[in-house]
Amino acid sequence: MRVVLLGPPGAGKGTQAQRLAEKLGIPQISTGELFRRNIEKDTKLGHEAKKYLDAGDLVPADLTNQLVDDRLNKSDTVDGFILDGYPRSLEQAKALHEMLERRGTDIDAVLEFRVSQAVVLERLKGRGRADDTDDVVINRMNIYRDETASLLEYYSSELKTIDAIGTMDEVFARALHALGK
């Protein structure tokens, strides 16, 4: 099963991605982890990504796409994967479709974890990170909303919306149900 997880910061995507990956026996693929791993291994792509990250810039889409494409070449993705944090734009979604089309497959499901701005603020404040101020979080939520509007339309036939308010177990059960598991 090939699954994309969408949701604003603080929606619990990372937690649910990890749990779903364990339950389904497929890898969780996070772009943040891909950046870190490639930087640690000092790969060519990691070296390129590091330049942007060190400057505080976003890693360009084409470089992120290359990192994801390389990761999808690994044998553990043959039976599926959970993508967490990718794609973030329509351009990346189309690139992902091309990557999978070359492999004779496509996305099976897209889960959007929905949560209110008030809940996100409460959750992120609980993390205790200095950059989780109300203004920063609201800005990140607005960016997410603006970026993903076109993604939700693009994935409309595979999209399932998950109520991400509740305990981790409740949200996990909803996600499994949405996947027919």
From Swiss-Prot:
Gene Ontology biological-process annotations: AMP salvage
Ranges for region LID: 126-132
Sites where the protein binds AMP: 31, 36, 57-59, 85-88, 92, 129, 140
GO molecular function, one term: ATP binding
SUPFAM superfamilies per UniProt: P-loop containing nucleoside triphosphate hydrolases
EC number assigned by the record: 2.7.4.3
Signal peptide residue numbers: none
Predominant subcellular localization, coarse grouping: cytoplasm
Function: Catalyzes the reversible transfer of the terminal phosphate group between ATP and AMP. Plays an important role in cellular energy homeostasis and in adenine nucleotide metabolism.
Known partners and oligomeric status: Monomer.
Protein family (similarity comment): Belongs to the adenylate kinase family.
Name recorded for this polypeptide: Adenylate kinase
Organism: Mycobacterium leprae (strain TN)
Lineage of source species: Bacteria, Bacillati, Actinomycetota, Actinomycetes, Mycobacteriales
